[in-house]
Amino acid sequence: MKHLLVDISAHGFGHIAQTAPVLNLLAQHRPDLRITVRSHAPTEYLKQRILVPFEHHHIALDFGMAMFDAIRVDVPRSLAAYRDYHADWTRKVATEAEVMRALQPDLLLANVPYKSLAAAKLEGIPSVAMCCLNWADIYRHYAPEDAGSAAIHAQLPDAYNSAEVFLKLSPAMPMHDLHNTRELSCVAQTGVARRELLRARCGASAQ
């Protein structure tokens, strides 16, 4: 593998926090690996977490859920956004597949945009999904089972199931509709002891 394409959701920074340690460790074993990261997150923040060279394409690959604030979901706006996002779904996946073909990756790692996975499948590019959650289950929680959402309820898990494997990081959602999951323990950046800096910032003495 020479070129890894990494698609990261920017719905909060937790997706980056899960993905960055994997990339940092992978680069230690494969220092010649070319990494392309596509995410709507700021480049400066990505560089704080991803400590190896990478090329950043600043684009939004999904939107997760529309939010009032950090914890409250704007359900009507979210459902409307999903209907718009999935309109003409087949064409959109084909367009994304063309973009991916131009990038020529050997593997896609997605945390956890799903259109990317569907496009990779169409283009014949191996793919791995990795996260503690997926938008299929979250959408199902909020969206009614009606004619307007039936296609979306099918397309979301189909996209995730198209990956070779979905690495389900603990603690995770159940993901009963996904048939390619493999459970892993949690992934996180290892901390560094900075006792003196902490004392200085807090104005605390060493005693």
Language model feature labels by segment:
Residues 1-52:
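N-terminal subdomain of nucleotide-sugar transferases
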Residues 39-44, 112-115, 168-174:
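Short, polar loop motifs at secondary-structure junctions
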Residues 96-157:
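Conserved nucleotide-sugar donor-interacting segment of glycosyltransferase catalytic cores
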